[in-house]
Design a protein with these regions (language model features):
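Pocket-flanking alpha-helical
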Residues: 50, 65-97, 161-163, 179-186
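Sec/Tat-exported extracytoplasmic proteins
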Residues: 56, 78, 83-86, 90-93, ...
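A bilobed periplasmic-binding-protein/Venus flytrap-type ligand-binding module shared by bacterial periplasmic
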Residues: 105-119, 129-131, 198-242
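Pocket-lining segment of extracytoplasmic ligand-binding domains
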Residues: 88, 125, 136-226
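Signal peptide-directed extracytoplasmic domains
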Residues: 86-115
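Bilobed "Venus flytrap"/periplasmic-binding protein-like clamshell domains
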Residues: 35-64, 106-162, 166
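N-terminal hydrophobic or amphipathic helices and topogenic motifs
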Residues: 2, 6-63, 67-69, 75-78, ...
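Solvent-exposed coil/turn segments that connect beta secondary-structure elements
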Residues: 44, 86-89, 113-115, 131-132, ...
Length: 267
């Protein structure tokens, strides 16, 4: 009788291999916990999608070729949300495409009661919205290199706008939306408050994020050139309240959502 080699038999080894392969397939496939929502971004909005995915547990994102491709896949049910430029969403709607709701994401803006940058001096008190090193701070620092100014501090948007109204600040910079109610109120209540354009010296400078693009904003009859990030967060409609809240929360935590909650949607 021939001696058997030590170890598992061939059949047993094959059986174990099949079991392991099945477990691996299940872990990668249908038995995995589903994402809260999937966001498909145009290439220009990819940095925003990445920031949202990092901020929202269970949120996934992928990159499409362009705005039209992202919105096409959204309407065909391949994802729950699309993150595209505002112009891309508008073009899609004008062509008869249905995307709803459409939320404004954060834009970089400068509100000043001290006139344009050339009028700023060492007495100009500047507030940057957010924290040092936060989203938008790099742009704010580039703006400040173009202006002569005095002191700089960081605060949240409400406090910054209140400082403008009280006269304890002369300029506010940061990722804010000029159409927000607080900004509209400040523009109405603060004498000589202006929504400034990006300094000409920055127009040709590569700003920190490739997704930043020149964009015209209108507010109260005023038109200002500023730089907009990302544009519009759209959904095709077949989205649960929980998914909607999750993606809005992720956008807010990533610092890119100017409309703070579902339902507060721009027309």
């Amino acid at each position: 009788m021939k001696g058997r080699k030590g170890g598992l038999s061939v059949k047993l080894r094959r059986g174990l291999a099949l079991v392991l392969a099945l477990l691996l397939a299940l872990s990668l496939g249908g038995c995995a916990a589903p994402a809260d929502a999937a966001v498909l971004c145009s290439a220009e909005a990819a940095p925003a999608g990445r920031a949202m995915a990092e901020a929202g547990a269970g949120l996934s994102y992928a990159v499409a070729e362009d705005d039209a491709a992202a919105l096409q896949q959204l309407t065909s049910g391949q994802c729950e949300f699309a993150l595209v430029t505002e112009s891309g969403a508008q073009t899609w709607q004008e062509a008869g495409g249905a995307v709803s709701p459409e939320a404004a994401l954060a834009v970089f803006a400068v509100l000043s009661r001290a006139g344009d940058y050339g009028a700023w001096d060492r007495n100009t008190r500047v507030v940057i919205v957010g924290e040092a090193g936060g989203f938008g701070d790099s742009l704010a620092q580039q703006v400040l290199t173009c202006a002569l100014y005095g002191s700089v501090r960081y605060d949240d948007l409400d406090a910054a706008l209140s400082a403008l109204e009280r006269g304890t600040a002369d300029a506010v910079l940061g990722m804010i939306a000029p159409q927000d109610e607080g900004v509209s109120r400040a523009l109405g209540r603060v004498r000589n408050l202006e929504l400034l354009s990006m300094p000409e010296s920055l127009i040709a400078v590569r700003v920190p994020d490739e997704a930043v693009r020149e964009h015209a904003l209108e507010l109260g009859g005023q038109t200002a050139q500023t730089y907009a990030l990302f544009g519009a967060l759209c959904t095709g409609g077949a989205v649960s309240t929980a998914q909607e809240e999750a993606v809005y929360r992720a956008a807010q935590e990533a610092g890119i959502l100017s409309v703070g909650a579902p339902g507060a949607i721009l027309e």
